Amino acid sequence: MNFPDIEVVSAKVHEAWIASKLAQGVISRKSEVGEELMVEYDLLSEAAKDLDRNTVKAVYAAINQLV
């Protein structure tokens, strides 16, 4: 099955995560090492981007198991 590019979807997942946090009144969220995570996807470290990438990869794997 051909899925959309992981980077493109990861950026969208990150946008949705930020929107969800903002809707809850959260304006800042930091990683375990103190990196601000509520910034544009392109501004994240590779380690922080991996959080979103891993989410997308897990969803893709789950879909593959269903088809």
For the regions a protein language model found, what residue spans apply to each?
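Alpha-helical propensity feature that highlights long, continuous alpha-helices across diverse contexts
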Residues: 1-67
